[in-house]
Amino acid sequence: MKLTTLQTLKKGFTLIELMIVIAIIAILATIAIPSYQNYTKKAAVSELLQASAPYKADVELCVYSTNETTSCTGGKNGIAADIKTAKGYVASVITQSGGITVKGNGTLANMEYILQAKGNAAAGVTWTTTCKGTDASLFPANFCGSVTK
């Protein structure tokens, strides 16, 4: 009779059960952490792409008003001044001769996003996209090297 009462008082987890749970958590963490880090870098790349948007519109207006790309430089012909001070993931945005170069900062320090305008007022403007850096795969698929209107 006393034996059954002792067995009912034993509650909790054994050391083996706790070690198995810890091992499972460790395995899941080794899979999840690299995926999360890659995801955050991809989100940061979108900041590089967004930084070029206002300059892209300015360069197009410049091309339509001057009929060439060579005079489309930051701070001239209606184009916003270049950004030379780092802010967030963007180190700088430089516009020169119709080209827009966005350099990354922080975890994206080795990355560059380059847009080059070609065309004139009659033909319109086309953009060639170039992505540089060791993590260029973080840019959207079929994005780098594309030509868009």
Swiss-Prot record:
CC annotations in GO: membrane; type IV pilus
Cleaved propeptide residues: 1-12
Membrane topology label: Single-pass membrane protein
A biological process from GO: type IV pilus-dependent motility
Keywords, in A-Z order: Fimbrium, Membrane, Methylation, Transmembrane, Transmembrane helix
Main localization category: other
Family matches, as Pfam families: N_methyl (PF07963)
Keyword Lipid biosynthesis recorded: no
Coiled-coil residue windows: none
Transmembrane parts of this sequence: 10-30
Residue(s) carrying N-methylphenylalanine: 13
Compartment list: Fimbrium; Membrane
Database matches in NCBIfam families: IV_pilin_GFxxxE (TIGR02532)
PANTHER family, sorted: GENERAL SECRETION PATHWAY PROTEIN G (PTHR30093), PREPILIN PEPTIDASE-DEPENDENT PROTEIN D (PTHR30093:SF34)
Protein family: Belongs to the N-Me-Phe pilin family.
Protein name as annotated: Prepilin peptidase-dependent protein D homolog
Protein's organism: Haemophilus influenzae (strain ATCC 51907 / DSM 11121 / KW20 / Rd)
The organism's taxonomic lineage, starting at the top: Bacteria, Pseudomonadati, Pseudomonadota, Gammaproteobacteria, Pasteurellales
